[in-house]
Amino acid sequence: MSQNTIHKIAVKKRTTTGKNENNRLRSSGMVPVNIIGGGVATSGAVNEKELEKMVHSGIRQSTLIELDVEGQGAQKVFVKEIQRFPEIDRIRHVDFYKVVPGQKIVTKIGIETTGIAKGSKTGGQFEHIIHEIRVKTIPEDLLENLTIDVTDLDVGDSIKISQLKVPTSWEILINGDPIVTSVNKTKALLAAERAEAKGSAADDAKAKKGKK
């Protein structure tokens, strides 16, 4: 499991909103943002370069961010939505969702693997099928991503959703119990097994014939 790394960024409060104000902010190197949740909404702006740097660091919906809001101090949030201009690669607007301790939220958690599956060394094909899951949990138990060790997976083995080791507060929102990772037999391995089985059958037939 990967604990949540806290990213920090300063927010300048704004009392004026609207298209003209947003354009003015962007021309000055700022990006308009909204902070929602906890019954209070705050409009603000953040430095575009600092925001892009944070976004390109690989933040997810489950990444904890600490906003230093002008006049309000530190507030822990998650990214709810990032809007970009379709014609240019620039962030247009960001909505942050304020963390309320003990109040469950729904977010997406990435699944990563570590190690080399044992079966992949003996002719098996390793497959990572599910890379992300939706989870309902309290903010205190959120992880940026879930890491599973696949070292002991042999040919024919798999890891299902129900086998994941997760915090007890997690409710994984998925239908059934699908396979997350597996090691399957390759065509070459299946062909080798068929050839071996055919050879064994031929040997058995010869042995029986010799006894007559």
Curated annotation (Swiss-Prot):
CDD domains registered for this protein in UniProt: Ribosomal_L25_TL5_CTC (cd00495)
Q: Which GO terms describe its cellular component?
A: cytosolic large ribosomal subunit
Enumerate the InterPro entries for this protein.
Answer: Rbsml_bL25/Gln-tRNA_synth_N, Ribosomal_bL25/Gln-tRNA_synth, Ribosomal_bL25_b-dom, Ribosomal_bL25_C, Ribosomal_bL25_long, Ribosomal_L25_dom, Ribosomal_uL5_bac-type
GO process terms (BP) = translation
| Ribonucleoprotein in keyword set | yes
One Gene Ontology term of the molecular function aspect = 5S rRNA binding
Could you list this entry's UniProt keywords, alphabetically sorted: Ribonucleoprotein, Ribosomal protein, RNA-binding, rRNA-binding
**Where does the source fall among the domains of life?**
Bacteria
In the UniProt record, does the keyword Transcription occur? no
Task: Tell me which family the UniProt entry assigns to this protein.
Answer: Belongs to the bacterial ribosomal protein bL25 family. CTC subfamily.
* Its job: This is one of the proteins that binds to the 5S RNA in the ribosome where it forms part of the central protuberance.
Subunit (UniProt): Part of the 50S ribosomal subunit; part of the 5S rRNA/L5/L18/L25 subcomplex. Contacts the 5S rRNA. Binds to the 5S rRNA independently of L5 and L18.
User: What protein is this chain from?
Assistant: Large ribosomal subunit protein bL25
Whichever gene encodes this chain, its name is: rplY
